[in-house]
Amino acid sequence: MQVIDINNNELVVQYSKKNNISLAIIGPENPLANGVVDMLGEAGIQAVGPTKEMAKIEASKSFARDLLLEYNIPACPKYKVFKSTEGVKAFLTDLGEGFVVKYDGLAGGKGVKVSGDHLNSHEEAMKYCDEIIQKGGKFVVEEKLVGEEFSLMSFSDGKTLIHMPAIQDHKRALDGDLGPNTG
């Protein structure tokens, strides 16, 4: 049973004050991207989770890629950000058959489509780009990287930085990395 709408920051703060909550642990991506940690902090309630500014690295694929490029981090694939289909076909041709199309926002783990897995042609990629545009979004087209994906979460209080063990998120519905992404 959901007590309140966790995507409404004001309701979260009101509920926390009313119930004398002194520490909130925020997990879902939407409230983090909406700045609930910031608002709880302003209300004097401690919260575990990134601020709205820090959550941008998860909430925006283009922000994350631009950050890698800005700081010369060698893990950045060749990419471009688009708001329309202008230039997409030419960039897909440049990338060849190894490409990825990513919705530039939160999509519950379902905004990324990879060539060979979800997209079997440049035409299918263009259709997905059109779907994103129809919803008013922008998107990233990038070269497909091959290898093991992992997540590394780190925690900081502003002075100390502690890394958790690297983990893998197996999103596919079926064994053997098959089936649709589950989010």
Language-model features: where?
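ATP-binding N-terminal substructure of ATP-dependent carboxylate-amine bond-forming enzymes
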Residues: 1-53
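Short, charged, surface-exposed secondary-structure boundary motifs
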Residues: 13-17, 56-62, 174-176
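Glycine-rich phosphate-binding loop signature in dinucleotide/nucleotide-binding domains
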Residues: 16-21, 94-95, 134-135
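Short, well-ordered alpha-helical microsegments
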Residues: 32-34, 88, 149-150
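A conserved helix-loop-beta module that forms one wall/lid of the active-site cleft
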Residues: 45-111, 116
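Conserved ATP-binding module of the ATP-grasp superfamily
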Residues: 66, 74-77, 96-101, 115-151, ...
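Short beta-strand-to-turn element immediately C-terminal to the catalytic PLP-Schiff-base lysine
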Residues: 82, 112-118, 154-157, 164-165
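Phosphate-binding core of ATP-grasp and ATP-grasp-like enzymes
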Residues: 132-136, 146-182
